[in-house]
Design a protein with these regions (language model features):
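Alpha-helical transmembrane-bundle signature of multi-pass membrane transport and export proteins
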Residues: 1-427
Length: 427
């Protein structure tokens, strides 16, 4: 296999100027968001010196993401996705500006900071599903997986760069400048999407409110491939997410050095960036379901071995492998969702994917913490990895369509429930 086919597929950057602008804006906004997150955590801790309040930062972001996300997808399936994204992006930028104002003023109650974060997350719950339809609408079917891989590697690179850069800016100038840079990043994201054409949903708009949410649930229940993709992701995150266990495992087995802990956290990201950079052969393979199952199984197996090893270097290698496997699975899952979902439902299903992608890891860290509290960090890691492996095997065995070769954009036969969910309401 040639090197050019192994490295990340950059055809979307050559063939689609609109995608190039979008990727530039998205990369900038992800960088700004990670810088702002460092500032938020530091500011809340500096104001309260309480782990309860710093924990509330995650709640202020996660709760609106779940609640508003249920209906944000329906909104994206009723109107022009470009306009919805632009309005929501302006809202996020305004929230970042208000965070900067409160940081410069000082002496603002911590509840105000959390409230601004919650509103910011509400806008993100709307912009995410709207942006989720851009790639399949802008790129040919055979380039969708490559476009998603480019999105993934840009996000992971900013995940590595953003916290470090945010810490430097925070130390030099304070939290207010971090928030201002975050607001600027949303201006760049606005620029990236401003030149897009109108992107209304194909066919009739979705039903409003709870009816639209129920349509999405009927689609997920009826489409075995998309349902299997989301269940596989939940198996990998809810059952085996290791991040919350790293401090305990580091203390139990590797001496408790903060440098080792930092390397553990970085190793997963390094694996993810490496997998994205070498994703060309994967995105061209045409079997995203099989790749996703293998990636999720490798993730679980690597975490089992990490829980059993006593060598920090072997542990780092296994975490790099786990990060690479997870990224491969995420790219493949997104490819399945983007290419197998009717456009009329894509906003709502993307919202479900967003909730799964963000809620699953939080639940997984909670599961790991509870099991470790009853037993040990090693037991929590090994049991989680084994349960992930068993769950992935079950999903793969019960959903043979996931293992089949399928050309991008060619859906499997759907059930009557699926067709009903995608059909417009005429009542």
């Amino acid at each position: 296999m040639s090197l050019t086919r192994t490295l990340i597929d950059v055809r979307p950057l050559r063939t689609s100027p609109a995608f190039r602008r979008l990727l530039f804006g998205r990369t900038a906004s992800v960088l700004g968001s990670f810088m702002a997150m460092v500032a938020v955590m530091y500011q809340v801790w500096d104001m309260t010196h309480s782990t309860v309040w710093t924990g509330a930062v995650g709640l202020a972001q996660a709760l609106p993401m779940v609640v508003v996300g249920l209906f944000g997808g329906s909104l994206a399936d009723r109107g022009d996705r470009r306009r919805i994204f632009l309005v929501a992006t302006v809202g996020q930028g305004v929230c970042s500006l208000l965070l900067a104002v409160q940081a410069f003023l000082g002496h603002v109650p911590v509840a105000v900071v959390l409230a601004l974060l919650a509103v910011h997350s509400c806008f993100g719950s709307v912009s995410g599903p709207a942006a989720g339809v851009f790639v399949p609408r802008l790129l040919p079917k055979e380039e969708v997986a490559a476009g998603l891989a480019l999105n993934q590697i840009s996000a992971q690179a900013m995940m590595l760069l953003g916290p470090a850069l945010g810490g430097l800016v925070l130390g030099w100038t304070g939290a207010g400048v971090c928030y201002l840079l975050d607001a600027l990043s949303f201006a760049l994201a606005f620029y990236g999407a401003f030149g897009l054409p109108s992107l209304p949903p194909d066919g009739e708009p979705s039903r409003t409110g709870v009816h639209g949410v129920l349509d999405r649930l009927r689609f997920l229940a009826g489409h075995r491939v998309v349902r299997g993709a989301l269940l596989t992701d939940l198996s990998a995150t809810v059952l085996a997410m290791p991040m919350g266990l790293f401090p305990l495992v580091n203390a139990e087995r590797f001496g408790g050095s903060p440098r080792t802990l930092g390397l553990f956290l970085s190793a997963v990201a390094v694996g993810g960036v490496t997998a994205s950079a070498l994703s060309g052969s994967i995105t061209r393979l045409g079997r995203p379901g099989l790749v996703m199952l293998c990636g999720s199984g490798t993730w679980g197996g690597a975490l089992v071995l990490f829980g059993l090893t006593s060598s920090p270097w072997a542990g780092l290698g296994l975490l790099v492998l786990a990060g690479a496997a997870d990224t491969t699975a995420v790219i493949s899952r997104s490819t399945i969702v983007q290419t197998r979902t009717p456009d009329a439902l894509l906003g709502r299903v993307t919202a479900a994917e967003q909730i799964v992608g963000q809620g699953g890891p939080n639940l997984g860290n909670l599961r790991g913490g509870l099991v470790a509290g009853w037993t040990s960090g090693t037991v929590a890691l090994v049991s989680g990895g084994l349960m992930c492996l068993l769950a992935v095997v079950f999903v793969g065995a019960s959903t043979p369509e996931l293992r089949e070769h399928a050309e991008p954009g060619v859906p499997h036969e759907t059930t009557p429930e699926l067709r009903d969910a995608a059909a417009p309401d005429v009542s």
